[in-house]
């Protein structure tokens, strides 16, 4: 210790609801304490802290016992001074960032065996699945056990239906319109409303996720898909309607938003061209938990966006009703990775 060091930092509470934050780190060389807001409510807000210092040092943001209260009008930096016992001073910065993570991305909270919380519904989108309801009672997305010591996870399974069409297990950020499933069988994309409002003050590099994959009928029989997308709504006065692309790759005619960045990976247990025509860029051991990274790609400068979605499917060509019955994709511990 040099006499003017910050040795520890803990966030105790906030004066307002809707806020959460985590300590990123203490950079002694550059005299910076970095805190990341995971969730923000209505500013201004007071962050109550406990901060450890060098022996008998004091600071301008804490009392003699190390307790302090720092008010923020926004996500902003706050300078403070640490004074050593001998009177030496050093200027520090309490740096804040806003790099939120997805709610319940470790999938420990469920309403029931089929519905992770928060549940995506019209007007309040979040975790949703095309398997939440079906005219043929397909329960392809369910709660399962994660890797050892990791609690609960999500399992997506590709199944047959009584009407002869294959149904892939799916999960995405948004909401699913189950009002007319039989009438929309020729346009399944129209039932998926992708996207949740999202913002950060740092660019997103991609997403990290724990996965387990098992193809239903041998190594070449099927592949799963993992994707992350940034979406920009054209007119913010309207309600977002974004169905992504049709199975043939064309954009859905009802979209009122544009995809401005995407990361997409095909996961399989075998390299090369698979029976469904896809080629995996993530080749993993069968039925074994792995941590993978899906990079976000875009042209030019980092794009402005209004919404974000992530999508997962146990059969990567499931929107074309292609795949293998019994294919399983398990996911857990999704984490957005920032630059």
Short names for language-model regions:
Residues 213-222, 234-237:
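Extended, low-complexity, turn-rich repeat/linker tracts enriched in Gly/Pro/Ser/Thr and Asp/Glu
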Residues 172-207, 282-286:
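Extracellular/lumenal carbohydrate-interaction signature centered on repeated Trp-anchored short motifs
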Residues 286-288, 302-305, 315-338:
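Extracellular carbohydrate recognition
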Residues 43-44, 199-208, 219-223, 303-307:
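Extended extracellular/luminal ectodomain segments enriched in beta-structured repeat modules
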Residues 143-182:
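Short carbohydrate-recognition loop motifs
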Residues 1-103:
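Beta-rich interaction/scaffold domains
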Residues 239-304:
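Extracellular carbohydrate recognition and processing domains
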Residues 97-134:
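Extracellular carbohydrate-recognition regions
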